[in-house]
């Protein structure tokens, strides 16, 4: 296993040992916001530091267990790297275990030398991925109105952007332009939301750069972008998170309530900035069960197949 992992790290080709398929979603020569540079994937310590080809890794449940829903997973990493195992693969496998198709997003990072507008790259990739899932939903056994998005930490910021920003940044003049780029629901784990007083400074710097104009701060503080069309959200955070202030989740939840968007917020006493699928302390360990029950309650997965 060590030798195999070393070969993967050296080659920079296949990122995920257990991924079913890698799906590049931008046609050759059509990717927006690019200088045309040819980049290679850069990986170290289960983190991706440079994305060569944006795309997504598909994980499907068995046909017998498939419940017809899908979730696009946005790994965290402070917009500097992608923590593709703990906030990617592990989540995908959990979703598969409850009958949900999962897609781990390999999105361009703002520090990519190929990006023209650094702050737009991640959202462009997320919007395109959602459109691509919609386009292939029938062949994958996915219902068109049950395509959600999940994000942890900075990935939660990207997921909240996808749900709250109505502007289309991913149109390239092909048939997918006519397809929805907005998710049907959001699952946010310890999300970065605010770019102002409660900002995670590393994520803000990596996304927006050093010179912070008020316009950019407001535009990328996603609690300020919530609107009546924003999809329902399930949000979790830990009170003792020393990296991303739980006020981020509270602000987003309050914004959803103000716009009369259905939302569920759970703030656990312990967990720090390490809420994940495994090894959560105390009551935080129940979050996956709560999330599954929420998806049943909201009608995104059927109750009859979950028992």
Mark where each language-model region is.
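N-terminal cap/lid segment of alpha/beta-hydrolase-fold proteins
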Residues: 20-65
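Mobile cap/lid helix-loop segments that gate and shape the active-site cleft of serine hydrolases
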Residues: 43, 191-225, 231
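Short beta-strand element of the alpha/beta-hydrolase
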Residues: 67-76
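Catalytic nucleophile-loop/oxyanion-hole region of alpha/beta-hydrolase
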Residues: 83-84, 90, 107-144, 281-285
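Short amphipathic alpha-helix adjacent to the substrate-entry channel of hydrolases
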Residues: 84-104
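Primarily recognizes the serine-hydrolase "nucleophile elbow" in alpha/beta-hydrolase
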Residues: 128-201, 217-218
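C-terminal catalytic histidine-bearing segment of alpha/beta-hydrolase fold enzymes
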Residues: 250-307
């Amino acid at each position: 296993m060590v030798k195999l992992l070393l070969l993967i790290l050296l080659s920079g080709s296949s990122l995920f040992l257990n991924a079913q398929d890698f799906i590049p979603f931008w046609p050759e020569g059509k990717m927006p916001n690019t200088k045309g540079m040819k980049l290679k994937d850069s990986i170290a310590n289960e983190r991706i530091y440079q994305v060569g080809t944006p795309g997504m890794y598909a994980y499907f449940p068995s046909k017998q267990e498939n419940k017809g829903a899908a979730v696009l997973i946005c790994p965290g990493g402070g917009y500097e790297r992608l923590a593709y195992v703990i906030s990617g693969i592990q989540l995908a496998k959990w979703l598969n275990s409850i009958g949900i198709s999962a897609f781990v997003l390999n999105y361009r990072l703002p520090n990519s030398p190929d990006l023209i507008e650094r702050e737009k790259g991640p959202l462009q990739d997320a919007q395109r991925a959602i459109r691509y899932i919609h386009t292939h939903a029938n062949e994958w056994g996915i219902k068109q109105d049950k395509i959600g998005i999940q994000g942890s930490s900075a990935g939660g910021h990207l997921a909240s952007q996808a749900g709250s920003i109505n502007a289309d940044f991913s149109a390239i003049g092909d048939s997918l332009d006519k397809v929805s780029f907005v998710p049907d629901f959001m699952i946010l784990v310890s999300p970065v939301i605010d770019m102002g007083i409660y900002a995670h400074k590393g994520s803000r710097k990596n996304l927006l750069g050093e010179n912070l104009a008020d316009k950019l701060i407001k535009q990328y503080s996603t609690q300020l972008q919530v609107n009546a069309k924003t999809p329902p959200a399930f949000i979790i955070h830990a009170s003792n998170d020393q990296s991303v202030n739980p006020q981020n989740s509270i602000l987003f939840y309050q914004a959803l309530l103000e716009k009369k968007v259905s939302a569920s917020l759970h703030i656990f006493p312990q967990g720090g900035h390490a809420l994940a699928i495994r090894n959560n302390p105390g009551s935080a360990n129940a979050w996956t069960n709560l999330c599954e029950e929420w998806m049943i309650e909201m009608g995104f997965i059927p109750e009859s197949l979950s028992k």
